[in-house]
Amino acid sequence: MNKQKLTYLTIGVIVFYICLLVAWHLYDPTAHFTELQPGADHRPAGHVRKADDVLIGEFFMQDSSHPSTLNSKPSALKGEWPCFRNIHRDNQTTLTPAMKWVEGDMKEMWSVETGEGHAAPVISEGRVYVLDYDEQLNSDALRCFDLQTGKQLWRRWYRVPMKRNHGFSRTIPAVSQGLVVTIGPEGHVMCCDKTTGEMRWSIDMKKRFGTEIPFWYTGQCPLIQGDELVLAPAGKDTLMVGIDLQTGSTLWGTPNTVGFKMSHSSVMPMILGGVQTYVYIGVGGVCGVSAEGGNRGQLLWNANAWQPSVVAPSPLQISSNQIFLVAGYGAGGALLQVDRQGATWTASIRDSYKASEGMSSEQQTPINYQGSLITILPKDGGGMRERLAMYRPDDLHHPVWTSAADERFGLGPYLVIDDRLFAFKEDGELYVYQLHPSSMILLHKQRVMEEGVDAWGPMAYADGMLLLRDSKTIKCLKIATNN
């Protein structure tokens, strides 16, 4: 009898759970849901974008402590260092007659923290511009500061997620005709009003030209010549391009018939064979493009006998028809000669050598100072590695002067002001030398960064103030005062 009851009970439990399972499958939990139509949540309209879209210049912020920034009067400071290597692309400038050197230690005027990188500042009419990378926002950020105080006036930024690769930021802005132009690490070109930060136009070089961004990101700095911006996207079809500075429209383009790819180098203007020329070292070789009149954008010549896989320094003209080429990672240096006979151009490598065999550089572009060539030798430069060195254009294998054995600068930058050379060790120590035709004399050295790391970004000078940076900090030193 108990066994029979247990059987009935078991059957009943099984039937119950079968019914429960069937009901669970038949029940529709969304039967009473109401579909929410677009706009029903009353949220403001957003941007519709694809996963890889970058809305260049999307965000803007003005410093609330500077409410008059957008309508400010011209600054009393008129000094300019408006682009990579200054306006003449020679990395040199002069003191105004009204100024004199600060003797001894130079005073720090201000200091600003940045995202990790090597993007360097420019100066125009009392303002400082730098294309930083905000690691918290994953964004390129054009920041504008007051030169005298270091206070941020405004910034414009856009999201572009990246992975750290020796930091993030790389390039130097260009300022001209009231505008500031930047190129981000991933090839995003942005043009803004230099006073207000108002967005003017933008170009994504990867999307428009099919540019392949170098492994260590874009190092190319924008070149402004008159009313046009010159870029070397080195994309699938376009080697070089001229952009209307005011509108962002394309003025001319050079077909990439040579098949070059983008390097870390920048376009340099030169006069060769009596012709204004844009010279560029790409991955694959070096080329010259006409910058004149109706021939603008015409490929005049190219050479591929010297083609390092990684190029950071830019080409340096050392005579009316000779260009010094240099790169790191074992590439060494080379001498390129460009000749013209009527409409016929020839470009040939006249000399090339390893870094330990002559004048070379890994990152910084050398300086041509009154016929003497100044460089910091690379890590593979033999016994003189990382030292300052001076060469003659007619002998690139034997220096006429080098810095002392304990004066080694790594990948640090250097510039010339009047007859003084300022060289910045990559660990944050500044050296000042008196320049002579065949030598330099050390005048002063000063620790600027207490624990400087990777101080590779180029320096800038204007109105008595020198801007320097390491991987995470920009500092301003007062190096000259009014008489």
Each predicted region: which residue ranges?
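Aromatic (tryptophan-biased) beta-strands that constitute blades/sheets of beta-rich domains
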Residues: 4-10, 22-114, 140-162, 198-211, ...
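Short loop/turn segments immediately following the C-termini of beta-strands
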Residues: 86-89, 133-135, 185, 234-235, ...
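Blade-level signature of beta-propeller repeat domains, shared across WD40, Kelch, NHL, RCC1
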Residues: 428-429, 452-483
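Loop/turn-rich, solvent-exposed surfaces of beta-rich toroidal or solenoidal domains
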Residues: 331, 357-437
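Extracytoplasmic beta-rich repeat domains
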Residues: 109-122, 137-138, 155-174, 202-224, ...
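Residue position within the beta-strands of beta-propeller blades
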Residues: 128-130, 182, 231, 280, ...
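Short coil/turn segments that connect the beta-strands within blades of beta-propeller domains
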Residues: 125-126, 177-178, 226-227, 274-276, ...
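Structural motif
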Residues: 137-141, 237-241, 285-290, 330-337, ...
